[in-house]
């Protein structure tokens, strides 16, 4: 490991003299790129509801504009991605044929946002324009190049790094080209956004900020309310520290224009080596500076992505400083296990170093364990931090998305999953391999969806839902969870036809704080509707609803409790692995009014809902079955490759803070 770290440090040092000058911050000033039709007041949607509807979408989508997708031979552009999201077919590569496989979504989404990696927008554009006369650096974008180490190094280096021979000494050539690519992306989103009263589809202008600083994943998807946006996206090559990105987004967008609004959604904390939710504040030494940074983070990042194709980031068993027993459902989609083996040679890794200058310790990717890599414990860590400085920097709502690199926005169906990375996993044999030698190996999955409770399917209504954190994530199915908390919720709400309106009137929805102080224990309305699915792919019934409670004890340890409040965890539901046929009964709808029997009015606490389906076949089991028995890789029989999953939905939390 020491040798690997030395190689990283040497490589960064050698690259240190290859960077260009940083651009003036004026290049990020907000500009109005709205199409003319979007500047007019729009009609109310036909399906408008004061009680709010559940809308499903994908806000983590890569197309051929992303350097890694292009290098794996994906040629689905943003137009194609939006087309796929809303029902059109697209074509994916297989070997030398870049349009060999035709795929179509099983059900159109309500909304989508293409989030191509903003890093190298300009470099890739110039390389394509210059063709054979392009500098040697451009080989990193070549067909079949995959994830080129030269590019990875540039998003790992803790300093600004662009190729001078392509971008010019001042970087202006790449900057101008990046603006061209960005404006084109904005125009595409504008073109697909439905502004009629039908409200059939909503698109968001978006991009990804892809920090892999010092070898830890610190990526964020940046989502704008409309097409009044910075003139150029703020990428890792422009803002090496995430708090610099937050500052620029606030100064240039939120404060810089009456019409610009933005939020960012971090993802893949599971492979961040504990850095995503670390409560150190490099450069902010006083409590006042730390408070300011925590407030800025919550303004820019009100939501976290808990699930995508690189696994689940909810929780993990066996972590230091986490008490409360084993949660078997935390073993779900642990992408990082294979990553640990690939990087360190073993799935068993040490705890992450968390001492001084821990954010300067280089990694080669996910290579250590830390509770600060997982959402559940970040929620509890936020309670502790609020007690210390008066601000909770981790008071976020919960979402999910796909992170497809095929342009397949919302392509989450397990039954016919075509992969996520072009020629990196173009065949069934690739997708069921459990090895780091295959880019799209079976530790990956289709990913999830974000659900938003909103009055209508418009940018403003959906964005407002994200701002107030009335959002939820699913591992793919369109489960509809509702979660309310209050001091006087009626106990018969589940049987009341006016359940939702009364819950809003007498409580708060997911994403909010329990109001005021009460000597009584809080009551929660916990409800979910199963995904009915489609005629071709029927949905699975629900098995159970669980409330997860988090708090910290007097020793500073994280405490957790998982309570099944509806359904039956022992209902006997299973799957015939010879055919993937589900067996056993479940529930189309579950509901309960639950009161916390262990409530302590002096103790900060956080609650969220997890709705769990009956077991079903994972995509890897389906694809092993579809291969002739004599052609199945040995991995099809490996215990390391999961055959069954329990799909699920997670609500945003509800918080309690003592007065």
Question: Across the structure, where does each feature detected by a protein language model lie?
Answer:
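The substrate-binding groove and active-site-proximal loops of carbohydrate-active enzymes
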Residues: 67-72, 165-179, 228-240, 364-373
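Long, charge-dense tracts
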Residues: 223-225
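C-terminal motif of bacterial Sec signal peptides marking the signal peptidase cleavage site
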Residues: 15-17
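Sec-dependent signal peptide recognition
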Residues: 2-9
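C-terminal functional module detector
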Residues: 19-78, 82, 89-141, 174, ...
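Low-complexity, serine/threonine/proline-enriched polar segments
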Residues: 140-167
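Cap/lid and interdomain-hinge subdomains that line or gate substrate/regulatory clefts
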Residues: 173-181, 197, 237-265
